[in-house]
């Protein structure tokens, strides 16, 4: 996949109508936005376009309205809060059809530097099917398309791919540019030693990632629920821990492949365990084996040190997926230890979206990382080496 895409700085935007696909899929509680990270992430691109005299038309999805208008998934609260953050009024166009009379009228009245926000693109069922009609309607509003929603770049939808069939100038905003720079460089030309830390519950979610990264990394670190499948494959006792029986052969294969390629394949050497899946006091095991009647819920202290040492010597570190059940206070220690090791390291540190990003932000290490990806599924597919349709649709 070509990572050298044209950006908003490569084109003339003054006086032009610019449709910007943002990621405003934010959590709402009683109409109030509870996490503003995605709004703040969109500001640099919007500010640049406003300051350079573009007519800025913003669009995004929120939640899963499944092609029907749902008032609780309206983008009205986003328009209100974004206006405050931008320090400039953003006109909201409340059309259930997204590109309706309100939107057309609002766009027709725009002056240079004005901003309009369209309604939730998933109010239209064609959006997720990349339907021609809705793509044309969106494209009819603008002369330039900017994609700045990395979180949906792995989806071929009307507002990410379809519009580019009808608008010739299609470029990326600052957010996607940053994702391509850090994730792209990490995957294509990483500074070595390159360490990948993979956690989370399931091996099956990370198969393609492990496959792709084994050709690039010096060390792979495995934590979270998926570690128990690898340990069982090597003949260790795992008690009642999570295991994917149908992935045991695959786990053996990966360990053999790592050995063949000279990649360090690190698995937990001790665990924090409990008798049931609850936030109860943890027992630390002596070694890799987990006693009968207990389940592993986090890596243990010896493993924390082993993993932290690997991170300390690295020049590039990518992390995707927690080391344990970090929602439980007794079992968040491994995740904290890895986050801290990355925060203290001099390496380029990249967090691959999703749960790891949430964990790092909750733990207060966010500003110590080089880059926190804004896309969970998108960054995973990127690490799998897949082409992301929302990015390949943009001008080289």
Swiss-Prot record:
| Catalytic activity entry | (2R)-3-phosphoglycerate + ATP = (2R)-3-phospho-glyceroyl phosphate + ADP
Q: Which is an annotated Pfam family here?
A: PGK
**Could you tell me which pathway this protein works in?**
Carbohydrate degradation; glycolysis; pyruvate from D-glyceraldehyde 3-phosphate: step 2/5
- Stated EC number for the protein is 2.7.2.3
Q: Which InterPro entries match?
A: Phosphoglycerate_kinase (IPR001576), Phosphoglycerate_kinase_CS (IPR015911), Phosphoglycerate_kinase_N (IPR015824), Phosphoglycerate_kinase_sf (IPR036043)
- A GO CC annotation given for this chain: cytosol
**Protein's name according to its UniProt entry:** Phosphoglycerate kinase
Per the UniProt entry, what species is this protein from, by scientific name? Clostridium botulinum (strain Alaska E43 / Type E3)
């Amino acid at each position: 996949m070509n990572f050298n895409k044209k950006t908003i700085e490569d084109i003339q935007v003054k006086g032009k109508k610019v449709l910007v696909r943002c990621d405003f899929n934010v959590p709402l509680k009683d109409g109030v936005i509870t996490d503003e990270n995605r709004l703040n992430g969109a500001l640099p691109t919007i500010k640049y376009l406003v300051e350079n005299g573009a007519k800025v038309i913003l669009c995004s999805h929120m939640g899963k309205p499944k092609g029907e208008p749902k008032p609780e998934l309206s983008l009205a609260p986003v328009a209100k809060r974004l206006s405050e953050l931008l320090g400039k009024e953003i006109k909201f166009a409340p059309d259930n059809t997204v590109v309706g009379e309100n939107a057309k009228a609002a766009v027709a009245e725009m002056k240079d530097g004005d901003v309009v926000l369209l309604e939730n693109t998933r109010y239209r069922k064609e959006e997720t099917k990349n339907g021609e009609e809705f793509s044309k309607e969106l494209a009819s509003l603008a002369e330039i398309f900017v994609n700045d929603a990395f979180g949906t770049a792995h989806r071929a939808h009307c507002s990410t791919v379809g519009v580019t069939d009808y608008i010739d100038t299609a470029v990326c905003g600052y957010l996607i540019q940053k994702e391509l720079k850090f994730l792209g460089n990490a995957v294509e030309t990483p500074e070595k030693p390159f360490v990948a830390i993979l956690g989370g519950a399931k091996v099956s979610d990370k198969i393609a990632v492990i496959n792709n990264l084994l050709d690039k990394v010096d060390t792979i670190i495995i934590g979270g629920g998926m570690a128990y499948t690898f340990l069982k494959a090597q003949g260790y006792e795992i008690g009642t821990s999570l295991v994917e029986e149908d992935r045991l052969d695959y786990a053996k294969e990966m360990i053999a492949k790592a050995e063949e390629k000279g990649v360090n394949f690190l698995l937990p050497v001790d665990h924090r365990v409990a008798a049931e899946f609850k936030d109860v006091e943890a027992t630390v095991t002596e070694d890799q084996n987990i006693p009968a009647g207990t389940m592993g819920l986090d890596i243990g202290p010896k493993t924390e040190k082993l993993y932290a040492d690997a991170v300390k010597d690295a020049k590039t570190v990518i992390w995707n997926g927690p080391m344990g059940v970090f929602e439980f206070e007794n079992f968040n220690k491994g995740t904290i230890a890895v986050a801290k090791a990355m925060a203290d390291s001099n390496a380029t540190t990249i967090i691959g979206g999703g749960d790891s990003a949430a964990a790092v932000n909750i733990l207060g290490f966010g500003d110590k990382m080089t880059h926190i990806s804004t896309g969970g599924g998108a960054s995973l597919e990127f690490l799998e080496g897949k082409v992301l349709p929302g990015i390949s649709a943009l001008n080289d």
